[in-house]
Structures are given as structure tokens and as C-alpha cells.
From Swiss-Prot:
Endpoints of the signal sequence: none
Catalytic reaction(s) noted: GTP + AH2 + S-adenosyl-L-methionine = (8S)-3',8-cyclo-7,8-dihydroguanosine 5'-triphosphate + 5'-deoxyadenosine + L-methionine + A + H(+); (8S)-3',8-cyclo-7,8-dihydroguanosine 5'-triphosphate = cyclic pyranopterin phosphate + diphosphate
Active site: 599 (for molybdenum cofactor biosynthesis protein c activity)
Designated name of the protein: Molybdenum cofactor biosynthesis protein 1
């Protein structure tokens, strides 16, 4: 390893002559968005002369020393958050394309040997990976690694928390965008708010672990809860981090939804006038968050200002995607394939040379937020020899093939590969020779690119005369999930009678009805009976709907919630592994559950209305739509 380090020092001595890039505001910054305050500052990094020699391997052209590595363990997630998951779904990598446990451990050791002292595991949702606990236990044994973090949505955290803590996890970021359980379901398209909040409370009980709650603020959706989150810091030693809404392909980003951190601070100051910023000396080095607090409160409040005031000049982080690509900038379009180099038998020295070459191509800062928002399906570009361009044209339409061809021609002639800068020409050629392949991959499916030739009624023959069942014999088996919902409206006095409120004390101090309380009619328990009926209906959907295939249901979850004194919500989520979707099963379950509620309660009133039944989401198969209704 000593020889490797010396070779990098020799090749990179020119770094001492470079000064850090000046901080520049986004030229696309809109006048309609509040300008960051003039007293903002750049966080200082350790001078390059005082950094240990090995860190030259992970030092870029702007004197930034990368000591923080984020590793994605999986592309999968058990939530479908609107700001993260495109409406039309994502194309997951095949299982054999995902980094194995041994590969992740090897890369972790390699980066730590080159100066990384902090590793954070992300996803997708990292805790859905089956071997996450033993994997982190092995990483925790690496000498020189000081901090291990996890970013999680908290759904599965409570049952894994103790083992992860013992394995060395001392940094925990939990995503929670609302303190309202119904709004949580709206944002994530899934249930589980109570489990997330329980995970936060359980984590705060542990010693030697920092807990942060990440909250993405979207104007008109959860900005009215900002002060409620700040109030959490009164009695909890937690850091609430408000994240500016960032544009990623498919998340319908709009400046109308964007709220800058300066606007958030104004909102907080109205309720907490003493709210103030920590001094530079109190801040952690390379901290991405601008940290504030209310004097006397136990916790902190941070702002991650990636859009309105970026922190690129102090960036010290690198990322490895779940399928093994090194990404030097979150918003960059380029990724370098480490997985294939490992599987081709590359030595540690060869991998370090590739990593160093990629780091040296890191730009001074990412693009402006409007430019980022306009980048659709940003491709993965693995830079290398032109003769090794690899594109899979199988099953692509003629239009797509032309687009890819034009894209590659433009790429090959671009300055990104053939630099005309005489000062750095030798260095660029040296770096490029160490990077392999060029390929294009979409991060998500795109409605504009879908083949429209198959927009036909699948249950009618092409001549339009005879109904028919769809042939699914050639389809592949995938995980299928569908979520349907029904809303029932009751006359104002009916639910009160059924709940028998005065006897059962089901009114809280705010005169709110208990949302998960069972109601009882003369026929018996209404909700329990209706859930049984809905479950039976799900299993018999093919007997009710003529062209539904008989399928083995693996999971059926029906939840009935009292929204207010006149409304009841039915959620039916159905899952299975098969060749066809389960949306009809979910809709049937929600419908029959609602009809049974009506039947159980009709003696009190015939004016109960099944207001609507709709499909909320479906996932799996070619036409995945994590959000159907808006």
C-alpha cells in the first residue's frame, strides 16, 4: 500500500498549486426565491499540507479531501415517496448486478485504506436487504473507520436497531416528512407512520448514537408543519434537518413546490424569535447542514440547502450505487463501474487508480437547480475507450435506437472525453485510460419513451368482436402489489351512536374520535366482520370478474380508519409473486369491505354513502404505477 500511495503523491503534486474554487451562486437562481443571506460562509477544510499522505488518493483538483463514503445496499424500498419515486416507477437492476456482501466489504476496506473514516449505508431502503446486519458487523471491524451511519425510513428499524448499534452504527438518519399519519400515507403511498415514530423514540434511548430526522419540505404539502418539527427539539436530543426539495427525474419537481431555507427560517422566527445559528467553531467540519437551535431546547435544527445555497466547495463525500458504480457528485451524470472491474479480477492497486482518476474529474460544483430539473433520465456514463462502447439495443424501438446513436456521437465528440485543454491534456489521457466502458442506462422508466403500439383493449380481440382472457404464459414472475381505497360517509350522528362514546371514553382532549376504534352494531363488530368479508372477496375475485386469472394471494392487508365524525376510510393492499397484477383483487377487497360496513350499519341509517373506490397504486410488472390517483 505504501508504494501505491507514493505513486499517487508523485502524480498529483500539482494539487498544491491549485486553490479552492470560489463560491458562486447559481446563475439560474430565480428572483422569486429568497436570496441567501450575505453573512453566509464557506466551511474551511484542513490545509492540504497537514493531511496524511494517503489522502492524496481521494483528493480532487480543487483540494477537496474525500473522507466520507456513502454506499447504497439496494435499489429497493418499502415506501413510494412522491419526491423520490417517479410516478411511473423505476427499473430495478437484476439481482446478479447488485454488489455482493464480499464486494461491499472489499470496497469499504479499500476506501478506508485511502483515507475514508466515515461510511453511511443508504438505499433504496438499506434495511430491506436481508444480510444488512452481518454486513455492517463486518464493516464495523475495519481498522481506521470511525463512524458508521445508516439513512433509513424507519419502517424496519426497531427490530434491527439493537444489533446494528452493537455492530458499530453511531449515526442514524431517519426520514420523516410529516407528523400526521394520514399525510404520511399520502406522501409515501404506504402505511406505517407509527412504526417510524416508534423507531425514532427507540433510537433516542440508546447511548453513543446521533439521531437526525430528515424532512423534505414541499410548499403546500408539509411546510405548515415546520414549527411542529422544531417543537420536537424541546425535549428530544434530536436534530431535525429540513431538506430543500430537490429535482430528480420523475419526481415532478417545480419551483412552485420549492421553499428555500431562508423562507423556512422566517417561518420559524415568527414562533421562536430566539432561534439562532451555531457559530462556525461549533459546526462540524464538512457539515452539509446549516445548524440552528432554540436556546433552552435539547435538540438542534439543520437546513440542507442543496438548491438555494450549495456546499460544493466543502464536499468531502463519494457515493457507490447498489449496482457498483462510483458517483463523485450526487447531481452528476457520470458514474464509473467498479463492480465489473472487481469481477474482472482487478487488483486493489488497479481499483485505486480508477477511483483516483474518477475523483480527479469531479467538477467544482454541480449545475443550477433549474438546469438539474430539466435533465431527464440522466444516463450512466462509464468513461473509457471508444472501441468499448456497449449498448444493448435489444427490444428498443427505432426511435430509441436513433436517440441512443445520436447521443453517443455527441458524447464521443465532446470535450468530456477529448479535452482540448493543453494544460491538462496529458493528465486527462492518463485518467481516461484507467476508466472503462461507455453505456447508457435510464434511472427510471419514462412515459414519453413507452411504446404506444400496444395501446389496445387487452380483453377484446383485435377485430373488436369477441371478449377474451389475456394470455400471460410468456410473462415473467415478479412481485406484484396493489393498493385500493374506499371512502364511506355517515350521517353525523351514526358513528357516535355506534361508538357509544360516553361509555367507552373515545373522545380525547381535542374532541377527536379514536381513529382505530372498533364500532359495534346489533349484528356484531362492524370492522372485524367487514375485514373478513373483504379478505374472502379478494380470494374470490376471479369468480366475480370474468377475465381475472385465478391467482394464489400471498398477502392481503385491510385497514379501516375513522377519519372524522362522519367519514371512514378502507385501505386494501394485496401482494403476490406472479405473472399478472392484483389491482382487481385490491379493488374488490375494498369494495366488499365497504359494502359489508354498509350492511352492518344500515339499521341505523340508509343514508350511508360509499363515496368513492379507487386504485391508489400498483407496483410490479411492465405497467407499474406507484401513484395512480393524485
Amino acid at each position: 500500500m505504501t508504494n501505491i500511495i507514493k505513486s499517487f503523491i508523485t502524480r498529483n503534486t500539482y494539487l498544491n498549486k491549485l486553490s479552492p474554487s470560489p463560491y458562486q451562486f447559481n446563475k439560474y437562481y430565480s428572483n422569486s426565491i429568497s436570496t441567501p443571506p450575505t453573512h453566509s460562509y464557506e466551511k474551511k477544510q484542513q490545509p492540504i499540507q497537514n493531511v496524511d499522505d494517503k489522502k492524496y488518493i481521494l483528493t480532487d483538483r480543487f483540494n477537496r479531501h474525500h473522507t466520507y463514503l456513502r454506499i447504497s445496499l439496494t435499489e429497493r424500498c418499502n415506501l413510494r415517496c412522491k419526491y423520490c419515486m417517479p410516478e411511473e416507477g423505476v427499473m430495478l437492476s437484476q439481482a446478479d448486478k447488485i454488489l455482493t456482501t464480499d464486494e461491499i466489504i472489499r470496497l469499504s476496506k479499500l476506501f478506508v485504506s485511502a483515507g475514508v473514516n466515515k461510511i453511511r449505508f443508504t438505499g433504496g431502503e438499506p434495511l430491506v436487504r436481508k444480510d444488512v446486519e452481518p454486513l455492517i458487523e463486518e464493516v464495523g471491524k475495519i481498522k481506521g473507520l470511525q463512524k458508521i451511519g445508516i439513512t433509513t425510513n424507519g419502517i424496519l428499524l426497531s427490530r434491527k436497531l439493537d444489533r446494528l448499534h452493537k455492530a458499530g452504527v453511531n449515526l442514524l438518519n431517519i426520514s420523516l416528512d410529516t407528523l400526521n399519519s394520514d399525510k404520511f400515507t399520502l406522501i409515501t403511498r404506504r402505511l406505517g407512520w407509527d412504526r417510524v415514530f416508534q423507531s425514532i423514540d427507540n433510537a433516542l434511548k440508546l447511548d453513543n448514537i446521533k439521531v437526525k430526522v430528515n424532512c423534505v419540505i414541499m410548499k403546500g404539502l408539509n411546510d405548515m408543519e415546520i414549527c411542529d418539527f422544531v417543537e420536537m427539539t424541546r425535549d428530544k436530543s434530536v436534530e431535525i434537518r429540513f431538506i430543500e426539495y430537490m429535482p430528480f427525474d420523475g419526481n415532478l419537481w417545480s419551483d412552485k413546490k420549492f421553499l428555500s431555507y431562508t423562507d423556512m427560517i422566517k417561518i420559524i422566527h415568527e414562533k421562536y424569535p430566539t432561534f439562532k445559528k451555531y457559530t462556525i467553531e461549533e459546526e462540524e467540519p464538512n457539515n452539509t447542514s446549516k445548524t440552528y437551535h432554540v436556546p433552552g431546547f435539547k435538540g438542534k435544527v439543520g437546513f440542507i440547502t442543496s438548491m438555494s445555497e450549495h456546499f460544493c466547495s466543502s464536499c468531502n463525500r463519494l457515493r457507490i450505487t447498489a449496482d457498483g458504480n462510483l458517483k463523485v457528485c450526487l447531481f452528476g451524470n457520470t458514474e464509473v463501474n467498479l463492480r465489473d472491474r472487481i469481477r474482472d479480477g482487478a487488483s486493489d492497486q488497479q481499483l485505486l487508480e480508477i477511483i483516483n482518476a474518477a475523483v480527479l474529474k469531479k467538477k467544482a460544483s454541480h449545475a443550477g437547480m433549474y438546469e438539474i430539473a430539466q435533465n431527464k433520465n440522466r444516463p450512466m456514463i462509464l468513461i473509457g475507450e471508444k472501441s468499448k462502447i456497449q449498448i444493448n439495443f435489444k427490444n428498443k424501438s427505432i426511435k430509441q435506437k436513433k436517440e441512443v446513436k445520436n447521443y453517443l456521437l455527441k458524447l464521443i465528440n465532446s470535450s468530456f472525453i477529448n479535452s482540448n485543454n493543453n494544460n491538462n491534456n496529458n493528465n486527462n489521457n492518463n485518467n481516461n485510460s484507467k476508466l472503462q466502458y461507455i453505456q447508457q442506462r435510464n434511472y427510471s422508466t419514462n412515459k414519453n419513451n413507452q411504446n404506444l403500439e400496444n395501446n389496445e383493449f387487452s380483453h377484446i380481440t383485435k377485430d373488436g368482436k369477441l371478449p377474451t382472457m389475456v394470455d400471460i404464459s410468456d410473462k415473467i414472475i415478479t412481485k406484484r402489489t396493489a393498493h385500493a381505497q374506499s371512502i364511506l360517509e355517515f350521517p353525523s350522528n351514526v358513528l357516535s351512536q355506534l361508538l357509544n362514546l360516553e361509555k367507552n371514553n373515545d373522545i380525547d382532549n381535542d374532541n377527536n374520535i379514536s381513529k382505530n376504534k372498533e364500532i359495534v352494531s346489533k349484528k356484531g363488530p362492524v370492522f372485524a366482520t367487514s375485514i373478513v368479508a373483504g379478505t374472502m372477496a379478494v380470494k374470490n375475485t376471479s369468480n366475480l370478474i370474468p377475465f381475472c386469472h385465478p391467482i394464489p394471494i400471498e398477502s392481503c392487508k385491510i385497514e379501516i380508519t375513522i377519519i372524522d365524525s362522519t367519514s371512514v376510510k378502507v385501505d386494501c393492499i394485496v401482494s403476490m409473486s406472479g405473472k399478472t397484477g392484483v389491482e382487481m383483487e385490491a379493488l374488490t377487497g375494498a369494495t366488499i369491505t365497504s359494502l359489508t360496513i354498509y350492511d352492518m350499519c344500515k339499521a341505523l341509517s340508509k343514508d350511508i354513502v360509499i363515496k368513492e373506490t379507487k386504485l391508489i397504486s400498483k407496483f410490479g410488472g411492465k405497467s407499474s404505477s406507484p401513484q395512480i390517483t393524485k
